[in-house]
């Protein structure tokens, strides 16, 4: 059983054409600590750019990396392999974009590990127009 990370980005919050997508991935505890240290929402760039790409795809060439720096983190796929999942730190210049970040941790078969004590750290991230959700799934 794992708790999986979901990044849900809503675009067009300022009256533009609305679109929404979700990305799922399971991160290691080390990556979760990195994500919990990020103080801003993890989002895509301006709504004028190309539509969002799948997690394995590279970011659109039109993205302004000086305004929307990216964070690359390795994640475990359902097959046990490694894949890349790209997240963007939200820029205050693009308040129309928002994300919902769902924490992810693998729960060992023997029960909850000592990492459970670190769960509050995942709640301290500052999310702009978003919130942290915790859920469990047996599919991933």
UniProtKB/Swiss-Prot annotation:
Residues 49-58 have a biased composition (Pro residues). Residues 43-77 are annotated as: Disordered. Widely expressed. This is Smith-Magenis syndrome chromosomal region candidate gene 5 protein. The lineage of its organism: Eukaryota, Metazoa, Chordata, Craniata, Vertebrata. The gene is SMCR5.
């Amino acid at each position: 059983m794992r708790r999986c990370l979901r990044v849900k980005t809503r675009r067009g919050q300022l009256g533009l054409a609305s679109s929404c997508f979700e990305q799922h991935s399971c991160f290691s505890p080390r990556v979760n600590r990195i994500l919990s240290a990020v103080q801003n929402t993890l989002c895509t760039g301006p709504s004028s750019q190309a539509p969002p790409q799948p997690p394995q795809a590279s970011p659109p060439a039109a993205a302004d990396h000086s305004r929307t720096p990216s964070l690359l983190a390795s994640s475990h796929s359902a097959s046990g392999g490694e894949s890349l999942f790209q997240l963007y730190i939200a820029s205050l210049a693009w308040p129309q974009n928002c994300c919902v970040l769902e924490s992810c941790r693998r729960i060992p078969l023997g029960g909850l590990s000592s990492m459970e004590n670190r769960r509050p750290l995942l709640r301290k991230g500052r999310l702009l127009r978003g919130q942290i959700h915790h859920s469990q799934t047996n599919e991933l």
